[in-house]
Design a protein with these regions (language model features):
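Short, charged N-terminal helix-start/capping segments
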Residues: 3-14, 22, 34-48, 52, ...
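Amphipathic, oligomerization/interface secondary-structure segments
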Residues: 46, 259-494
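Long, contiguous, compositionally biased segments that the model treats as domain-scale units
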Residues: 1-239, 469-472
Length: 494
């Protein structure tokens, strides 16, 4: 495909000239290297002045501690403009006083590279659209331009067949003057010739294009990529890596002499997202996907997702954090899962006062009246008319489809009680003596599943699909088994 994006999982090198924005005539040769894992390194022949000096007197300077960092470094390489952002010198070698005079060298690390444009920084509104590809986006889209036909004769394969292409209409949704468009890009058939075989190929790539009403900056594009990445991570119930990110530059469309419109110039972004997508790895099993665009149409889902993610961002970040970077110790995961549940309950704005406000004020006044003046401030801070963690967990369990919850959590009250006890013991005592490791793991997985079901419920996932997920999804089935083994009250308590 023409204008192929630069994939974040593929390494690359760009040899060119590099300079600081304030000194465009002082250009240094060097090589920019990208390691295919999110790391960027610029090796210069020569060096930008990173030392910090204080002028003591005319012709007299004193070198201070620390070193300079550069927000932006510009470059040109392979007939493309390059902007490096967040640049820090990590090694400089100078030849002052050396026996053999040779060029200085310097190595600079950068957080982000824009290949194809010069911009003044992360806040520069230089882009009109972004296009994003994320792992397993094709599976979630539940559509393809490709189809296959196998010929048969009398019900027996006859050796004939065909792969055909039929373009798929793009799906779009507009949210607060921002257009999200789910589209396919495909190649026509081509051949890989080798000495031992010939392989015919066709490619279909799914991406989401985000177009803003007004020119936007890089930080807005990165947020759009994160929004898409989080959606696919939720849908696939696993860490979803960004495969590539391209930006369309403002004001670069042109009219050709024959009347055709030349598309806008594009720039590739190389950076380190939460997870780097592996473009050539095997797709996940379709049975692992919680929902697709067949179940929740793209046009309806995107407005809901933008709204839900906006109000439940903290809870979603914490619960997805258990997928992107699960801690090796169950205690960390316990705090993360329960914290996500608390943040979710607050974000949903469903909090109910345990005691009527007027009655609570009377009780509080009476209690504080019995406390000595010097301790009254401490007691005043601790007396609150807020739901407990147990109340919040019970409220969350009451929101999704109750048949799904019943299959997932055998005894909701016991789960809420044991989860509250475990979190409080860990947070306030530093240990959980009344819980085994297996029970803590069951609490983490069950609480995480309840949070996820709540988010899916907010997105409008039908009750039937919620039940199917609990019954059929491999990880949810395992969570159910753990809950039924560890989160049921002993017979003596029942």
């Amino acid at each position: 495909m023409s204008n192929d994006p630069l994939k974040l999982d593929e390494s690359g090198e760009w040899a060119g000239l590099w300079w600081l924005p304030e000194a465009p005539d002082e250009r240094l040769p060097g090589v920019l290297r990208y390691d295919g894992k999110g790391g960027l390194s610029l090796s210069l022949i020569g060096a930008f002045e990173e030392r910090i000096f204080q002028q003591l007197a005319p012709g007299v300077k004193d070198e201070l501690e620390g070193f300079r960092v550069w927000d932006v470094i510009y470059g040109v390489a392979q007939q493309r403009e390059i902007t490096l952002l967040g640049c820090v010198p990590i090694r400089s070698r100078r030849s002052i006083g050396a026996r053999v005079e040779s060029p200085d060298t310097q190595t600079v690390k950068a957080t982000t590279a824009i290949i194809g444009a010069h911009v003044s920084g992360r806040e520069d509104a230089a882009f009109e659209a972004a296009e994003i590809s994320v792992e397993d986006l094709m599976l979630w889209a539940a559509s393809s331009v490709l189809s296959a036909h196998h010929g048969t004769r009398n019900g027996i394969p006859d050796g004939t067949g065909a792969i055909s292409v039929k373009p798929v209409a793009a799906q779009s949704a507009t949210v607060k003057n921002t257009e999200y468009r789910l589209g396919h890009t495909h190649t026509l058939p081509f051949w890989d010739w080798s000495r031992g075989k010939t392989v015919g190929r066709m490619c279909d790539v799914v991406s989401i294009r985000v177009r803003w009403a007004e020119p936007s900056a890089l930080k807005t594009a990165l947020e759009a990529a994160s929004l898409v990445q989080d959606l696919i991570a939720l849908a696939t119930h696993r860490a979803a890596g960004v495969i590539w990110l391209q930006l369309e530059l403002v004001g670069t469309k042109a009219l050709l002499p024959d009347g055709r419109m030349l598309p806008p110039r594009r720039a590739d972004v190389l950076y380190s997202p939460v997870a780097v997508g592996k473009s050539d790895e095997q797709a996940i099993d379709p049975g692992s996907v919680l929902f697709t665009c067949e179940m929740l149409p793209f046009e309806e889902l995107m407005p809901h997702w933008c709204e839900v993610r906006g109000k439940l961002q903290a809870a979603i970040n914490m619960i997805l954090g258990l997928r992107y970077a699960p801690a090796r110790f169950v205690e960390n995961n316990l705090l993360m899962a329960v914290g996500a549940a608390e943040a979710l309950h607050r974000g949903l704005s469903i909090e109910e006062k345990p005691i009527p406000e007027a009655e609570f004020k009377k009780i509080r006044k009476a209690v504080l009246g019995q406390v000595p003046e010097e301790y009254r401030g401490r007691f005043k801070e601790s007396i609150r008319n807020s739901p407990t963690l147990r109340d919040r967990l019970l409220a969350l369990a009451a929101r999704p489809d109750q048949q799904a919850i019943g299959q997932l959590v055998p005894d909701v009250k016991h789960w809420a009680k044991r989860t509250t006890r475990a979190r409080n013991d860990l947070a306030h005592e530093g240990k959980t003596p009344d819980h085994s490791i297996d029970e803590l793991i069951a609490i983490v997985d069950t609480t995480s599943a309840v949070v996820i079901l709540n988010v899916l419920h907010e997105l409008g996932l039908p009750a039937e699909r919620q039940c199917e997920i609990v019954q059929d999804h491999p990880r949810f089935r395992m969570t159910c088994r753990k809950a039924w083994e560890w989160l049921v009250p002993p017979e003596s308590d029942s």
